[in-house]
Amino acid sequence: STHCISSAASDVYKRQEDDNEKLLAVIDEMNSYVGTTITYDFDVAKEVLDGERISEWLSVDDDLNLVVDEEGVLSFVKELASEYNTCYKPKELKTSYGSTVTISNGPYGWKINNSEEVAQILDDLKAGKKVEREPVYAQTANSHGENDYGNSYVEINLTAQHLFLYKDGVLVTESDFVSGNVAKGHATPGGAFMLTYKTLNAVLRGPDYETPVTYWMPFNGDIGMHDLTSRKAFGGDIYKTRGSHGCINLPYSAAKKIYETIDKGYLSLIHISEPTRLG
């Protein structure tokens, strides 16, 4: 009957109208997404994410819903990370003795939190605004300049068996130390490490030792700086045959001064270089 036909036709028209409305809505949504600009502030540089890149991530499914390619967003974040992350990347250090060394190991440095940054981009796209911000970091460093470590760090020179503690560019203290016993295969590894935590009155234990210390400052697993009052001499060649299990053994007064100055996250730059003494 004609009635059935007209009813079917009106369903089709209704469907078309709904689709048109949905289509217009999804076009609006896409325009809003493409109008988003995120300017990343890296201090020494800025990176801009805008519609040109964003449009590559957008598509519409069969039900006319906007789909964002999260893999595409993630690969953008990975590009940012490979450009601006500095953890595990080589660092040049002009040593306190004047020479320049490369420290090529260690977790210290900027590190973008990829999954959280993807989530933040998706939120920014939904909001459709122009924003300027830092990326979401899993880990931060002192500086975005040429050297990410800035001017606050402990410089631990394994060759000279001497360390320097700098805070805001000022030398707070320096001291001889004894590091890991080279002859027994306990040489202290070089690298850029953060202080994991610090604690008073710890007992350090290993398979064949138990050492009570007053100031314990680990930075690389169970390797750290601490006082060792049973040692009467520090520096020189002691470490080669009578060194520690890997830790940086310090005179009590130096350990105390360092402990009072540094906190969790403070940087230790450990390197091997020619032991030319200052002066």
Name each model-derived stretch.
Residues L74-S75, A187-T188, A202-S273, R277:
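Exported/periplasmic cell-wall-interacting domains
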Residues T2-A9, Y13, I270-G279:
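Single conserved hydrophobic/aromatic residue that forms the stacking wall/gate
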Residues S7-Y40, S115-N147:
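Soluble, acidic/polar mature domains that operate outside membranes
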Residues N105-G185:
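Cell wall/extracellular polymer interaction/catalysis modules
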Residues S75, S82-T86, P90-I103, W110-K111:
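Extended, domain-scale alpha-helical bundle/helix-rich regions
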Residues L58-V67, I103-I112, Y149-S152, T214, ...:
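Second-shell loop/turn segments in exported
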Residues E71-E79, S115, A119, D123, ...:
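Solvent-exposed, polar/charged alpha-helical surfaces in well-ordered, non-transmembrane soluble domains
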Residues D148-G235:
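Gly/Pro-biased beta-strand-loop elements
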